[in-house]
């Protein structure tokens, strides 16, 4: 396909959190009121954001996906509840879109983070849908952007089966502690691996010949950290399946894995005043959860004495073997406000003043643009594999509402899908 055919591929329809209704507070009884006002008001959060799943629960929408709890006892959310994933069968069983949900990380918000502060933040997180599966809806509707099953909304991925991975470990699916830490479970890696193993055993995933890995923000980071691991796991499982089916020596079957991370390429940067805040927060999170052991294997080998570098893709981008289409803002809001800690925007931003022309903060903002371009270069320049698509908005990730995506057709990327 040409550039025009790629317009929707680089647009992620991200759903902010995985809030769903609890089993003992079914949303079905509220369908009548939803039909009139979607029950979306100030009380929405108290009702587990049920209106988010109106179509799935009440309308029998084709966009509905079923929640599948993992039977692996090691795959646990922060609070110890079972990991899970959403599965929606697509029209073409040979195609699967995997989407890893974002939602930040488990870290101490202080400028000088401590492990105690990180654990405290994890404990607070464990009481929400980003740290527990207890409130996740048994069905969930995905009807926007690249997750939609409607061809007019999603001409590229509409016929793919969808495997949606809700986020409940706070470490971008990297936590790897066999026991508990202050009563918390850091089992992101176990959730990650158990999800793919279970899906290949119990859904049509085992028949897939093409798998696209995507995710936004912390989910996009997870794609960059884990794409090669997932590709190896799927290839190994496929080969084992071929042997069991007697295909040994006859070529067997293969699976093509492609990566499409959105807004997950975060840089190792201090604040605009030179304080090492963001990198220190990530190091504390990784130390508490033993996430270092789950990071990119090639990077860990390259920086054996400095595993903390492998938290940041800029240090290992050229080592990523999976074909990758990188989607990233040149002025990512998360980096502007939480990494650089700027309190202004280059242009009009909701809730933030415009940076003064010629000021230090404005120059830092434009320096971020060049730092991203430099960091992406090793990934982009690899012959025959990846490409990138950058945007100049301050959104942390791309979304599709009622916008016309055809305006996004021109980009600096060659087809990888």
Label each region the model flagged.
Residues 1-12:
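Classical eukaryotic N-terminal signal peptides for Sec-dependent ER targeting/secretion
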Residues 14-26, 60-64:
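N-terminal signal peptide
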Residues 23-59:
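Secreted, short cysteine-rich peptides and small extracellular cysteine-rich domains stabilized by multiple disulfide
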Residues 60-417:
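C-terminal His-loop and adjacent cap/lid subdomain of alpha/beta-hydrolase
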């Amino acid at each position: 396909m040409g550039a025009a055919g790629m317009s929707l591929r680089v647009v992620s329809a991200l759903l902010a959190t995985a809030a769903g209704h609890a089993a003992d507070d079914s949303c079905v009884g509220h369908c009548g009121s939803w039909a009139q006002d979607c029950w979306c008001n100030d009380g929405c959060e108290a009702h587990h954001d049920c209106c988010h799943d109106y179509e799935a629960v009440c309308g029998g929408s084709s966009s509905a996906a079923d929640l599948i709890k993992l039977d692996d006892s090691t795959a646990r959310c922060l609070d110890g509840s079972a990991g899970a994933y959403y599965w929606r069968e697509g029209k073409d069983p040979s195609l699967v879109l995997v989407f890893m949900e974002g939602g930040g990380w488990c870290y101490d918000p202080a400028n000088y983070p401590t492990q105690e502060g990180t654990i405290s933040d994890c404990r607070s997180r464990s009481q929400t849908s980003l740290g527990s599966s207890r409130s996740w809806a048994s069905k969930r509707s995905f009807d926007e952007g690249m997750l939609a099953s409607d061809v007019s909304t999603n001409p590229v991925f509409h016929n793919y089966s969808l495997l949606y991975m809700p986020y409940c470990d706070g470490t971008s699916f990297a936590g790897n502690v066999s026991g508990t830490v202050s009563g918390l479970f850091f089992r992101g890696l176990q959730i990650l691996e158990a999800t793919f193993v279970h899906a290949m055993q119990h859904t049509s995933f085992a028949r897939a010949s093409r798998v696209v890995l995507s995710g936004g923000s912390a989910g996009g980071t997870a794609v960059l950290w884990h794409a090669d691991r997932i590709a190896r796991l799927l290839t190994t499982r496929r080969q084992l399946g071929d042997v069991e089916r007697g295909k040994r020596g006859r070529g067997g079957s293969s699976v093509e894995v492609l990566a499409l991370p959105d807004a997950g390429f975060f840089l190792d940067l201090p604040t605009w005043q030179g304080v090492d805040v963001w990198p220190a927060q990530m190091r504390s999170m990784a130390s508490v959860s033993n996430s270092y052991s789950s990071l990119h294997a090639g990077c860990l080998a390259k920086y054996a004495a400095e595993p903390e570098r492998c938290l940041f893709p800029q240090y290992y981008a050229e080592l990523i073997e999976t074909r990758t289409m990188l989607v990233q803002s040149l002025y990512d809001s998360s980096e502007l406000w939480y990494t650089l800690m700027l309190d202004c925007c280059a242009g009009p931003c909701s809730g933030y003043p415009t940076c003064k022309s010629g000021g230090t903060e404005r120059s830092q903002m434009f320096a971020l643009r060049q730092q991203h371009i430099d960091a992406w270069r090793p990934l982009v320049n690899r012959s025959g594999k990846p490409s990138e698509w950058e945007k100049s908005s301050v959104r942390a990730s791309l979304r599709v509402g009622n916008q016309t995506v055809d305006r996004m057709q021109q980009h600096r990327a060659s087809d990888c899908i």
